[in-house]
């Protein structure tokens, strides 16, 4: 049999362990707040204005949907048939874009990273930056630098997306063979392999008003 001292010790051990056993898990940090939600979802549930978005949660829209998120002074917006997952980073947010269209507006001294098809887009300088990104296919992006230049990084290559331009960007993980000199009949030693092919598209139209951000 247990001695009174042994029983008392066992009881104390049980009481000490109770707070840990029944402790409420630490909630994930809030990333942002929904400012617009029409035919939209937060994770698998219908979204509405005022909902908090927590670390690692997904946002999405239906065919005619629209959704806006405020993350401090950063604004994000999705148009129809779009989806993304949000994460906190130092001074801003990281967006894992999965499909559709994304618009973002980021003031100076804030940080936005958009990860799409294994490419990473971010402001090229510490300044107000507004941009629109579309996933066209699993290898093609359309990027509009509405205000401020963007830096595009894909594997070990980088490109600057110039302000005021729209580009169609083809990403080739194996590298596309290209002539460096541009002359027909160049010998094989003058060929290089680039993983990023950029084509200039149409001019930019749109901004905060078009995307319904206030």
Which residue ranges define each predicted feature?
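Short amphipathic, positively biased membrane-proximal segments
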Residues: 4, 190-193
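Bacterial N-terminal signal peptides
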Residues: 9-19
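Flexible, surface-exposed loop/linker segments and immediately adjacent secondary-structure boundaries
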Residues: 24-190, 201-206, 210-211
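Bacterial N-terminal signal peptides that target proteins for export
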Residues: 1-8
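Alpha-helical transmembrane segments of integral membrane proteins
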Residues: 193-199
């Amino acid at each position: 049999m247990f001695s009174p001292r042994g029983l008392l010790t066992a009881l104390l051990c049980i009481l000490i362990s109770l707070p840990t056993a029944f402790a409420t898990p630490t909630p994930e940090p809030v990333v942002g707040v929904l400012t617009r939600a029409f035919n939209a979802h937060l994770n698998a549930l219908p979204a509405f204005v005022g909902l908090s978005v927590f670390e690692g949660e997904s946002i999405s829209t239906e065919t005619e949907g629209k959704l806006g998120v405020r993350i401090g002074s950063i604004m994000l917006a999705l148009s129809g048939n779009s989806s993304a997952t949000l994460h906190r980073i130092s001074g801003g947010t990281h967006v894992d874009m999965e499909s559709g269209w994304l618009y973002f507006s980021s003031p100076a001294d804030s940080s936005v990273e958009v990860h799409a098809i294994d490419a990473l887009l971010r402001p090229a300088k510490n300044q107000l930056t507004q941009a629109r990104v579309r996933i066209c296919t699993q290898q093609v992006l359309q990027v509009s630098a509405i205000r401020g230049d963007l830096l595009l990084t894909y594997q070990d290559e980088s490109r600057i997306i110039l302000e005021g331009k729209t580009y169609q960007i083809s990403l080739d993980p194996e590298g596309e063979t290209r002539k460096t000199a541009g002359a027909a009949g160049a010998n094989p030693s003058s060929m290089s392999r680039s993983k990023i092919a950029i084509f200039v598209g149409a001019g930019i139209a749109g901004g905060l008003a078009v995307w319904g951000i206030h």
